Amino acid sequence: MTIVVCAVRPDSRGTIMARSVDPLQPPAIRPSYLSAASDEQVLLSGTRHARRIFEAPPLARHSAAETMPGSTASSDDAIIDFMHRAGMNLHHPVGTCRMGEDPMAVVDSRLRVRGIAGLRVVDASVMPTVTTGNTNAPSIMIGEKGAAMIREDARAA
């Protein structure tokens, strides 16, 4: 049996930055997983809860020994250390192209990339946070809305 503990609404935020003006150079990607203490606490609580589920009498007799992080990781610090060493992203990262009017925003409210005429970002990159459920439906909605904006702007031109 397997239980995977994950933070479906993480507070941690990473960055993607250009390393150079050369567009062929790969960007610097810093996901900063678990940089928010709240994410550590969510995963710590989830790990403790998962252990209680497996220790409950109906499951205990069917459960094998815990493999990760393992029964020796009993303190909060040991569990959090394991999360930092072995944790990974299980969902779809979003929000790599901030939308808004502030100077750090990549796209404006009509999904146009600032400073590059004719280029838009019409995908999950503009979501401010990851959705609790799969990102497919909201991505389709962004695509439909973006297509409508492109048609509107073409008619107005």
Each model region followed by its residue ranges:
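FAD-dependent oxidoreductase catalytic-site/capping-region signature
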Residues: 1-132, 136-138, 146-157
